[in-house]
Amino acid sequence: MSCEVLRKLEEVIRRRIEEKNPESYTYRLYSSGMHNVARKVGEEAVEVAVAALAEGKGRVVEEAADLLYHLLVLLNSTGLSLADVCAELEKRMR
């Protein structure tokens, strides 16, 4: 299964960061520093777990989408990409 939307989202994130538009949530988050980006990823991960335990499937999907977005921002902030994660997953499947 391929999820092309993640690659597109990764490109949007990269572009928003390059544009340095202070009205962009993505740019503001990125500019706030790695500590804040990592904290946001942690918050979103907890929200996915809470949704899985106490809320419906729709809520889990919504929170998982938030987590994936914030994880892509974190990867970009560290100079990594979705391709790096995919390569690691492929290695683990051998």
From Swiss-Prot:
Its EC number is 3.6.1.31. NCBIfam families: histidine_hisI (TIGR03188). One of its GO terms (molecular function) is phosphoribosyl-ATP diphosphatase activity. GO terms for cellular component: cytoplasm. It is found in: Cytoplasm. The gene is hisE. It catalyses: 1-(5-phospho-beta-D-ribosyl)-ATP + H2O = 1-(5-phospho-beta-D-ribosyl)-5'-AMP + diphosphate + H(+). Pfam families: PRA-PH. This is Phosphoribosyl-ATP pyrophosphatase.
